[in-house]
């Protein structure tokens, strides 16, 4: 969203506040444009969660570059999060609705990843929102739909087990430990995600 600070009916500050306070829209990048050169207004804008604050006059190419950089950074952060399941990789603003949402999602998986019965329906119920909203929010914040997020979290845990293990654990045991009922399916998913077989890093095969 690109908005001017000074607008009729609703100014840019109020619009950005409403956007950032609504869970369905809080992830959307917000760029504030203004002819008012004010350190106070700029600080207030960033406190609300505005992503960029540009003073007029400005070069349109600079605006395009700022937008491109924001989107590129978000794609980079999503990729880093996918391979770590670490909330900090997303660089979400502290004390924001987005940070609360994704932290809750990761904490639920941290608590339940070993439970093979912990499925998408239970996850959505525990998140406390509709399936449509949770799925849209997960894709917007992480680039992953719910099911993929849950599977990737389990695979990341499995990789840590392999990396930190002593080599006396087999593939089947790891699969069951992270909530997979089928070791063959686990191996297939692991290979697709990390590019190597889990057994190649173990002392013995499952």
State where each predicted segment sits.
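Sequence-specific DNA-binding recognition helix
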Residues: 119, 165-202
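The C-terminal output helix
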Residues: 68-85
């Amino acid at each position: 969203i690109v908005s001017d600070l000074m607008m009729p009916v609703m100014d840019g500050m109020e619009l950005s506040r409403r956007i950032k306070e609504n869970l369905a829209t809080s992830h959307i990048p917000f760029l504030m444009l203004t002819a008012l050169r004010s350190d106070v207004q700029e600080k207030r804008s960033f406190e609300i969660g505005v992503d960029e604050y540009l003073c007029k006059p400005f070069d349109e190419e600079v605006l395009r570059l700022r937008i491109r950089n924001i989107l590129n950074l978000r794609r980079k952060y999503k990729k880093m999060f996918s391979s770590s399941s670490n909330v900090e990789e997303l660089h979400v603003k502290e004390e924001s609705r987005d940070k609360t949402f994704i932290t809750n999602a990761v904490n639920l998986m941290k608590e339940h990843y070993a439970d093979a019965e912990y499925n998408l329906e239970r996850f959505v119920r525990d998140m406390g929102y509709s399936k449509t909203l949770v799925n849209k929010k997960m894709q917007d914040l992480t680039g992953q739909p719910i099911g993929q997020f849950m599977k990737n979290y389990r695979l990341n845990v499995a990789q840590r087990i392999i990396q930190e293990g002593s080599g006396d654990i087999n593939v089947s045991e790891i699969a069951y430990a992270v909530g997979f009922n089928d070791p063959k399916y686990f191996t297939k998913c692991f290979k697709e995600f990390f590019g190597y077989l889990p057994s190649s890093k173990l002392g013995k095969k499952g």
